[in-house]
Amino acid sequence: MDDKWRESAPVNDIEASSWIRIFRAFDTDHDGLIQCEEMQKTIRDSTYSFGFDHYELQKMSLYLEMREGKPVDFADFCYLMSKCKGYRLREYLFRAALTVTPKNQRIHVFSELQRYKCVPPPIFLIFLSIVQLAFYLYYVVDSSEGVWLSGPIPTMSPLIVSQYHLPELWRLFTYCLINVGIFHIIFNILIQLAIGVPLELVHRWRIYILYFMGVLFGSILSLALDPTVFLCGGAAGSFSLIASHITTIATNFKEMENATCRLPILIVFAALDYVLAVYQRFFAPRIDKVSMYGHLGGLVAGILFTFILFRGSKPSRFYTVSFWVSLVLSGFFIAICITLIAAPSMLH
């Protein structure tokens, strides 16, 4: 195997802890940063401490020069060490984690990533995207409608949410496998891969809960407020991911990479998908309609479960209070939706 791919296994615990020790040893003012000039001098004077050979030393010097004086935090340090040592897989993991992790949480996250054994591997959202695409293509062929913005809508599918199949509880989750329209399937897959996979890499099993709570909140909100139409599509799950990421950016604005650009782009991108959902609900030239409330349910779940699931390694008072408030609000949301769903049958 190519030497650059030799690090398919995780960095061992000794090497992982040594990276933290090295960084802290040379972070003399304990501000979480090492100045580039200082690090250049350090690696020349203490090459053995870094475990570098001559070639790796040259690469690190070049990478530091390319930073043009920008200080090195622990995330940058791990990324540069991986590049210099040819740990290609580790380099990709760190690069993905940089996009979704606030700077004040990176020491904990990157320390965990160094020991990450890819068990389970971060393929849940990749696999889900493949399944969604397969179902979309199947129903496109089966319906003979072709590829367009507002269809097909497989109303007879055993996966779709409908008020006529309330006892079939699996539909509250399986509807996310069916997508209506080419724009929706592209939007959902892009969000799941671009945002969801890095989040899954950092947060692992918590992302499964976040996604499916978004799906559940979307289905019960739709049945509560718009029961006369169908619900299908992965938008609730995708909106839970995008809402969670937007919440993280908003609450850690100064700590996120490119937050000023990323936040408005995400909001506009999500708004376009929701505008299309509103069009399909009220203005599309077809009899069978699809609810737009799945998006809103996913949005609510994404915001609330960000505080429930992602509290960081050192929870602050703000996150502790937010955790309990979000937990209570989630309970109220579910209770109110179930009451509204059950009310018509109870009144008759």
From Swiss-Prot:
Record protein name field: Inactive rhomboid-related protein 2
Keyword Membrane: yes
All residue ranges annotated as the EF-hand domain in the record: 14-49
Binding site for Ca(2+): 27, 29, 31, 38
Membrane-spanning segments: 121-141, 177-197, 207-227, 229-249, 263-283, 290-310, 323-343
Protein family: Belongs to the peptidase S54 family.
Species this chain originates from: Caenorhabditis elegans
Entries under Pfam families matching the protein: Rhomboid
Bilayer topology: Multi-pass membrane protein
Keywords, comma-separated and alphabetical: Calcium, Membrane, Metal-binding, Transmembrane, Transmembrane helix
Effect of a null allele: RNAi-mediated knockdown does not affect vulva development. Does not suppress ectopic vulva formation in a let-60 (n1046) gain-of-function mutant background.
Matching PANTHER family: INACTIVE RHOMBOID-RELATED PROTEIN 2, RHOMBOID-RELATED PROTEIN
Annotated Gene Ontology cellular component terms: membrane
Coarse class of the protein's main subcellular location: membrane
Biological role: Probable inactive serine protease.
Xref: InterPro entries: EF-hand-dom_pair (IPR011992), EF_Hand_1_Ca_BS (IPR018247), EF_hand_dom (IPR002048), Peptidase_S54_rhomboid_dom (IPR022764), Peptidase_S54_rhomboid_met (IPR017213), Rhomboid-like_sf (IPR035952), Rhomboid_IM_Serine_Proteases (IPR051739)
Top-rank taxon, per record: Eukaryota
Localization terms from the record: Membrane
Entry GO MF terms: calcium ion binding; serine-type endopeptidase activity
